[in-house]
Amino acid sequence: MPRDLTSQDSVRQDSVAQDSVHRDRVIAGRYRLAGPLGGGSEANVQKAFDLHSGDAVAVKIFRCSDAANEAPFRREVDIHGRLRHKNIVRVLGSGTTGHQEGGEIRNFLVMELVEGMDLRTLLHHQPASPRETAEWVSGIARALTYIHRRGIVHNDIKPGNILVNLAADPGGPGVAQLTDFGIALTGGTATPGSSSGTPHYLSPEEVRGENSTTASDVYSLGLVALECLTGTKAFPGPPLESMVARTLGEPRIPGTVRRRWSMVLHAMTDPDPAGRPSASQVVGMFRRLSR
């Protein structure tokens, strides 16, 4: 049965409401803003209407155009903008807003509007069922397979960067779609200490300041899968405490998790990157789990 998603607390308006980008404002002469969808430290996301096509879209507006925000924006344009996959939120365009209040000029991305919620919000309501977990995690694993074959490491796999498109799967679990490539890496690996992903989902090697690789994405997805089933972070607590725990052992998998699932989760969160399955192997593992 599809879960009840009538609650509207998925819209995180606290930081967005303070932003100088207002509802009904038209940016770049084309996109009429229609209200906040969410936001983070670097950008806020607004629902908008494309006045040229009439389509509803999502516009990600970066908070300022200084050097600190220019790099994530360029990565989104150069990396995310060229990706085309069912399980990746599609970038439709980009630009600058022109002069804002206070004379600021802001970069923005135009993306497909996903009718649903981010995974963090869904798990706040209740843990996912095994069926939902298998569907969502295998979808993101397919997205990772696609980007890894192109030499891209997402570098920030977490529930907040996974959107569940409910409209694309009426009556079903929904289609999981990966978003936010602001700290993605190209070339397959990064220089040591380069990871700036979310502390609670970093791999042990990233915590130690080692290379971020495709195996690091798989580890983070393993933590997401475990959180789907339990409703709680695998390594809770303050960020530093959580990261230290990562280097001391594997995540604890409750006895309530079925043995077949436990084996897959242990493989994905192997402390040794070389011991983890590839993203394409994860797809096969979850296909077998869902039978």
Task: Tell where the protein language model's regions lie, with residue ranges.
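Protein kinase glycine-rich loop
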Residues: A34-G40, V45
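Conserved catalytic-loop aspartate of Hanks-type protein kinases
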Residues: D217
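Protein kinase catalytic-loop region centered on the HRD/HxD motif
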Residues: R142-I152
